[in-house]
Amino acid sequence: MTAYLDRRKFLVACGVTSVAAAAAGVGGELLISKRFRVNPSVVKLTPPVVKPRPLPKDTALNIPGLSPFYTPNAEFYRVDTSLIVPQVSPASWQLRIHGMVDNPMTITFDELMKLPMIEHDVTLTCVSEAVGGGYIGNARWQGTLLAPLLRKAGIQPGAQQIVMRDVNGMNLGVAVDPVMDGRASLLAVGMNGQPLPQAHGFPVRVAVPGLYGYVSACKWVVDMELTTFGAFNAYWVQRGWSQRAPIKTESRIDVPKAGSSLPAGRVTIAGVAWAQHRGIEAVEVNVDGSWYEAKLAGQDTIDTWRQWYYVWPATPGPHTLKVRATDKTGHPQTALVHGPEPNGATGYHTIAVTVA
């Protein structure tokens, strides 16, 4: 398990640099020469049949240092096993749906783009995310719903998971139930109003609200096989991670930063909280052992994170700050400290600051 974790940590650490740091060790000239062969700008996004409702005015707070509500594409985290970003031409892209279905099918990119398109805001999260970490991002995704395609294929009784494969053969396994339960599970072609960036799955990727990316966020997807959990263990499941991966209720302090030296007086503590497909009901901030209710920004959808803030009357001295959230089902974030394996880290994000 250690070797696999080391590899995962390496890939996570590459982040938005798209593994450029590894170029010297794996053929930097090859990485640079092939990375931009396909130009996503040639794709023209189809207008969605129904546009999302406008964001509530108070959804995005204007607090310096707070994560923006929408994560810019260039800053969106990247975690995958591709040391060289795949170059997939829309003209040659196809998606095969097969396995435990009555009507196996193959769909081309042109056929996909003729299907009804929607836009939906979804916060994606990596299971490798440590408490308080940065491998989470929110975007407006454009695509077609996956469920109607699967209904057309005719899912057979007993099918439990969809094994999704990318152009390089990497596989992820997502449970059938959450994909078919009415949530906006997408074959996405757009991100924040632009065609998918290459590093985030161009021309087509999967985005399923409420599940960690290692089971749901297949980039460069070209194959979906309906099967059972007993018949196949996907890549990360073989390495000790859970088959089902609902995202846990979590929260993070964005400002102030850990170790900050702050002036006495009114200090704004702010951050984000998330419980995708359940939504955030409340956030509390702990200062030196006492809990205080934070103010929440507006909720976009239950599939996105929610900004929050608390104005703290800071007094001189060292202080410890913590945060916890409660989701809309009434379940609070757990205080139990646990690492990411096998299904996501837990505990309260905690930082130390000093007030002069």
What are these regions (language model features)?
Residues 2-18:
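N-terminal secretory signal peptides and thylakoid transit peptides that target proteins
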Residues 21-29:
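Hydrophobic alpha-helical membrane-insertion segments, chiefly the h-region
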Residues 29-356:
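Structured, non-membrane catalytic/scaffold regions adjacent to prosthetic-group chemistry
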